[in-house]
A protein has these predicted regions:
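Short beta-strand element of the alpha/beta-hydrolase
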Residues: 90-91, 101-113
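Disulfide-stabilized, aromatic/cysteine-rich ligand-recognition loop
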Residues: 1-30
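Primarily recognizes the serine-hydrolase "nucleophile elbow" in alpha/beta-hydrolase
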Residues: 173-242
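Short beta-strand/loop motif that positions the catalytic acidic residue
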Residues: 243, 249-251, 255
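Conserved alpha/beta-hydrolase "acid-adjacent" motif
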Residues: 256-263, 290
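Cap/lid segment of the alpha/beta-hydrolase catalytic domain
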Residues: 109-181, 230
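N-terminal cap/lid segment of alpha/beta-hydrolase-fold proteins
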Residues: 55-100
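Catalytic histidine neighborhood in serine/cysteine hydrolases
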Residues: 268-289
């Protein structure tokens, strides 16, 4: 125990009729899942789970709501049918000016900060501008529960609630509807779609590509498995073996959110991608890999599996 002069200690005085002390002496159960022992569901059961993400292929009724002209790229805010409850969603489309269409679209799944944000700032993609500089389009969907679509969702952590389950299903549909929209644009190579996930998006990279097979290459920046339990219908454990696309995992050795042995390694091992099409790099870092390496490895991966930009 650290008893330095700057540290104190806390005392408690209990009352005669106080029963809380017994609870304070009770055992605290640690939040932990041993993924070496847990097994994913069989294919027949998973096919039933996959049916949750079906939606009617109604007209997208897409509309460009706003255009922002920057020196090196153009930004479009588009809205279209979300695939459920007659709801509309939005996506920000970033188009490089120094490259010729059609563009390879890289669809981003953001980190948890966007759950707590009330409004998306289209100028904030600074650390991801290398995607545009490589000649690719960068697609930022606004998922249910984030930014302007903020609702009662208050965490990215999976949990055993209908609220969480419903959101995962909505995110899956929204991603697919975003792909549907990209397929309508002549300036997009919709057969060369990349998935880029960051933190929460790295975790969701173990789910979304199992649902949406039009994704052709995946890069996960600090992703892993969570210790929280959730309903099996949306448990990442059951989706990972069905992620079969080429996938690159970039992780930190000191990541406190996704520890190497209990989170990162089980995710990598459970992936259904053949061993020669998946790769994991661990850096001497925490929940953020060095930017230079992130940029280099991401572009090399997309060049290899989507093809170099011409």
């Amino acid at each position: 125990m650290d008893r330095s002069t700057s540290n104190g200690f806390r005392c408690i005085k209990s009352f005669a009729n106080d029963t809380s002390s017994a609870q304070l002496k009770g055992t605290i159960s640690a939040l932990f899942r041993d993924y070496r022992k847990e097994k994913p569901v069989d294919n027949k059961t998973f096919a039933l789970y996959l049916n949750q993400y079906l939606y009617d292929k109604k007209p997208l009724e897409s509309k460009i709501e706003r255009t922002i002209d920057k020196d090196l790229w153009k930004i479009e805010k588009v809205t279209f049918d979300a695939g459920y409850n007659n709801e509309r969603m939005q996506a920000w489309i970033y188009l490089p000016k120094d490259a010729k269409p059609p563009f390879q679209p890289i669809i981003f799944f953001t980190g948890s900060n966007d759950i707590y944000s009330k409004e998306f700032d289209p100028k904030r993609i600074g650390s991801l501008d290398f995607i545009l500089k490589s000649g690719r389009a960068f697609i930022f969907p606004i998922y249910k529960g984030t930014n302007e679509r903020h609702d009662e969702l208050n965490s990215d952590l999976q949990e055993e609630t209908v609220l969480y389950k419903d959101h995962v299903i909505m995110w899956g549909k929204e991603f697919s509807r975003t792909v549907d929209y990209l397929e309508t644009r002549s300036d997009m190579q919709a057969d060369k779609i990349g998935y880029l996930g960051w933190s929460w998006g790295g975790f969701m990279g173990g789910i979304i590509p199992a649902i949406e097979k039009r994704i052709k290459a995946i890069v996960l920046n600090v992703g892993g498995m969570e210790m929280n339990r959730t309903f099996p219908e949306v448990d990442q454990l059951n989706y990972l073996p069905r992620v079969t696309q080429p996938i690159l995992m970039l992780n930190g050795k000191h990541d406190m959110f996704f520890p190497v042995e209990t989170s990162q390694k089980p995710m990598y091992d459970l992936l259904g991608t053949p061993s020669n099409f998946k790769k994991k790099i661990v850096y001497d870092a925490g929940h953020l890999v060095p930017r230079t390496d992130f940029v280099k490895e991401t572009l090399v991966w997309f060049d290899q599996y989507l093809g170099p930009v011409k």
